[in-house]
């Protein structure tokens, strides 16, 4: 008899080791037709979020809300509800369509659970001006979190937020009609966020936080106090128009106070601000070793691409803006330019702006403001402008190997000089030794001013801004090491020999 008991215990231990804790995982169903005294099975579901919050969940468990139905309250999960790397805790919908979590004046879900997946749900708040105090999705101080395929709207404090999250993913998030921001990530009281991936998201019409009278609000996607992050294939538009203050303002997609941030293959258009900014993309104060590449910006009230050092920020250094396109940005704010470099404090230096294509019939190609910034180099760009090439009050960066041409029917001037030749002779810009390396010539660009694309997944199909077969920009740029290896459309770019000028390598 003793031998049988020992074998029975051994078989249980072996089963647990082989199958892991997920062997004990359960699916918990929540339905508007349920009852919280039920066991939470599909046939006998729970009814409320309160029951969910009163339950401790195990790795591999699923919390399933009935699709097409609305559930009032805030889902609250903590570290005791965490999954494991192999058996994640999942919060999602079941049946037809998505379930809606109505956070009312509070939040939709607040979680500190690691190894968590939240997907296929709608989160709605009372409205940024109708009593909402919360956030749609707030994940904090945990790791290995996935947010996918959600719609979040009506939250004053923001749509979807990572705070102190390590190894987090947000994909296919539609954030709209929120206050402070559509999507954001940053530090908690305990730690920075790190190793983040934000992709295939849309931030639309997040106008501003009516209660924030001291700082920017109405951002599309913003991350700060983050190390190692990629934002790609996202669209941000019509954000920031109702920020309730003047001063520093929102941006479509941007990052600040971090390291190794890449923003690529994104579109930012028609973003606004009643104060400053309101631009497309921004690498902001305290950022190092970060890149804006392969993006499209157009019709933003602020600059399409902004490099900015705010007061008291940490060092801003070794940042790159390359192979992007800007069309008619800077329509209202800052120095009314496509690209803007601004230093309100020391510590900003050593940044590269190369192989971008700029078309601006409404303002300048590039502007410089605030303090002088050492080590700013502008190479291999195409500037098609309807007036002044350069505006602003501070010392200029170094221009080399760029092509300049006026918008049809306009006259282009150069930092107060009437002609390109006068500018070069007076300033030494566009010269390496005694050789003039810049050109005042029609760059041969296809359909300038005609970009209207809104789907980042289709950027490779953009017809406008390619080079014509006879373009003088083909193979005439200055070699740049570690140039990313590709152009805006995915064509290979040489590393050691002459690339083309602008965002397009080949017709």
Would you name each region that the model predicts?
Residues 32-66, 70-72, 76, 106, ...:
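Acidic Gly/Asp/Thr-rich repetitive segments characteristic of extracellular carbohydrate-active
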Residues 12-13, 23:
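Cleavable N-terminal signal peptides
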Residues 32, 46, 64-73, 82-135, ...:
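Right-handed parallel beta-helix/beta-spiral solenoid domain characteristic of secreted/periplasmic
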Residues 417-439, 444, 450-454, 460-507:
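Surface beta-loop-beta hairpin patches that serve as ligand-binding interfaces in beta-rich domains
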Residues 76-79, 102-109, 129-138, 154-163, ...:
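Extracellular beta-strand/beta-solenoid scaffold signature
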Residues 58, 66, 79-81, 86, ...:
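Parallel beta-helix/beta-solenoid
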């Amino acid at each position: 008899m003793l031998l049988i008991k020992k074998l029975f215990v051994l078989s249980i231990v072996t089963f647990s080791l082989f199958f892991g804790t997920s062997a004990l995982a359960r699916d918990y169903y929540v339905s508007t037709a349920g009852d919280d005294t039920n066991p939470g099975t599909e046939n006998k579901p729970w009814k409320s979020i309160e029951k969910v919050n009163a339950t401790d969940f195990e790795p591999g468990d699923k919390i399933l809300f009935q699709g097409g139905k609305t559930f009032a309250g805030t889902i609250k999960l903590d570290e005791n509800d965490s999954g494991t790397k192999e058996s994640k805790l999942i919060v999602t919908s079941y049946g037809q369509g998505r379930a809606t979590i109505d956070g009312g004046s509070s939040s939709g879900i607040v979680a500190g659970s690691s190894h968590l997946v939240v997907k296929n749900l709608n989160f709605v708040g009372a409205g940024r001006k109708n009593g909402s105090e919360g956030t749609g999705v707030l994940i904090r101080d945990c790791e290995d979190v996935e947010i996918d395929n959600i719609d979040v709207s009506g939250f004053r404090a923001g749509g979807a937020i990572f705070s102190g999250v390590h190894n987090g993913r947000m994909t296919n998030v539609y954030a709209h009609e929120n206050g402070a921001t559509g999507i954001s990530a940053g530090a908690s009281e305990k730690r920075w966020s790190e190793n983040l991936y934000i992709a295939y998201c849309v931030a639309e019409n997040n106008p501003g936080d009516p209660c924030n009278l001291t700082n920017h609000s109405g951002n599309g996607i913003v991350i700060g106090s983050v190390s190692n992050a990629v934002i790609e294939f996202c669209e941000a538009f019509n954000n920031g128009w109702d920020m309730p203050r003047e001063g520093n303002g929102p941006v479509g997609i941007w990052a600040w106070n971090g390291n190794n941030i890449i923003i690529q293959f994104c579109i930012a258009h028609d973003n606004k601000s009643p104060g400053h900014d309101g631009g497309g993309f921004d690498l902001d104060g305290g950022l190092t070793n970060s890149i804006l590449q392969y993006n499209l910006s157009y019709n933003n009230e602020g600059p399409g691409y902004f490099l900015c050092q705010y007061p008291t920020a940490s060092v801003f250094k070794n940042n790159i803006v390359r192979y992007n396109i800007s069309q008619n940005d800077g329509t209202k704010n800052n120095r009314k330019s496509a690209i803007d470099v601004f230093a309100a404090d020391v510590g900003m230096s050593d940044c590269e702006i190369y192989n971008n294509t700029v078309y601006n019939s409404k303002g300048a190609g590039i502007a410089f403001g605030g303090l002088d910034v050492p080590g700013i180099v502008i190479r291999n760009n195409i500037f098609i402008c309807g007036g002044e090439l350069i505006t602003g009050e501070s010392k200029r960066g170094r221009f080399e190997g760029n092509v300049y041409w006026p918008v049809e029917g306009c006259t282009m001037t150069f930092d107060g000089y009437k002609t390109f030749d006068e500018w070069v002779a007076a300033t030494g810009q566009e010269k390496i030794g005694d050789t003039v390396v810049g050109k005042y010539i029609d760059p041969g660009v296809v359909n300038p001013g005609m970009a209207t694309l809104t789907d980042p997944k289709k950027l490779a199909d953009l017809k406008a801004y390619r080079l014509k077969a006879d373009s003088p920009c083909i193979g005439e740029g200055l070699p740049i090491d570690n140039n990313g290896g590709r152009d805006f459309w995915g064509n290979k770019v040489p590393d050691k020999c002459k690339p083309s000028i602008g965002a397009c390598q080949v017709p």
